[in-house]
Amino acid sequence: MTIEERLNEIVEKGQGDAIIPFLQGLTQEERKTLVPCLNKLEEHYNKFVQLNENTYGTRGTPEQHRIINLTALVIYSLKEFRKHEWGIYTEQLNELIPWYIPSWIDSFFKEGESREFGGFYGMNYETLMDWIEQGVLTLTPSPQTIAGYLVNYMNNTDFLQKRAITLKEHIWYLFQYDCGQNWTDNRTSGQPYFSFRYFVEHGQLDRMRVLKESLLAVNRNLNKNLSSWFAGMFTALNPSTEEQLTLQPEIFAVLSAPHSRPVNIILGLLKNLCTHPQFQVEEFLSQTSVLFASDVKAIHQNTLAILHKLAKERKEHRDTICCAAAQGLTSQEESTQSKIVKLIQTYGR
């Protein structure tokens, strides 16, 4: 029996236990000679046919597809694999890893990083890290790729402590990319930001860095729900007055965020912080043109509330405060206009 005949027999009879010993016994030259045979098997068993009166599907059984997939990983070049296969099943590659790793696996993985479907069925953070540690993958995945897989474990504090690199490096990638982090709250019994709060409280994540990154994330071109989620993380950690004063540059940067909810969250904090002697009045006043340019009434009202407090407490800044408030006179809201006029009449010269 030729090797072509034996491969056909294994596939036709669904002899799953026989395929790996068969592949292990092939020389490099024999693998190449099997390519035309495998091409025909791919075409035959992947063809959609009518299975019964009301059902259509591929001609091959799940076991036949597994046999073909394993064979493809061993004998195909990257070009041939792309032509015949949509992706790699991680559990199938794991069957081969003890004795064989496709030479092109790094290239295939890298290509997948730039696509919506990464090219691997069943890939997750655990498998990814296992492959890196085993040398299956010799490249370094992009931070966005790592974050995309890690986010699915954000409610498992035990798992997140399994590898030092997870908390030391990888968890910070979640502040940089949209991975649906805000949806993790739905799986933590109403405890928002559970893992972040847990690791901060236990000293395993630097508290000031978490606070700072949550503010920086708001302006990282994320969708409005996720931007609000990060702003909410900052307030959920109950930053002290001293922490807020230290992070004033990052706090003020949020005021120019493209979404209104994070802006209002921060304005709510500033209503209390603005009376502190170390509050950077001039830096805040430089943001008022952006705040009054918003078409959201609540932003105008919150900004005016802060300006009123500042005018009352900081006599040396009253002229500048009144000029800043005057920018809001273009508002279409009569209540906003009247409050501005009252502020100027009260504190202006």
Model feature map: region roles:
Residues 1-199:
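Non-catalytic protein-protein interaction scaffold segments in large eukaryotic complex-forming proteins
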Residues 3-5, 322, 326-349:
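Eukaryotic acidic, Ser/Thr-rich intrinsically disordered low-complexity regions
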Residues 8, 212-220, 249-260, 285-297, ...:
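HEAT/HEAT-like alpha-solenoid repeats
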Residues 15-16, 31, 204-208, 223, ...:
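Alpha-helix initiation and capping sites
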Residues 203-204, 237-245, 273-281, 310-319, ...:
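Flexible loop/turn segments at the boundaries of HEAT repeats in alpha-solenoid HEAT proteins
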Residues 227-230, 263, 300, 337:
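Residue-level detector of extended alpha-helical repeat arrays and alpha-solenoid scaffolds
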Residues 230-238, 266-275, 292, 304-312, ...:
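Hydrophobic residues within the alpha-helices of tandem HEAT/HEAT-like
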Residues 235-241, 245-278, 285-290:
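Amphipathic alpha-helical interface segments within eukaryotic helical scaffold
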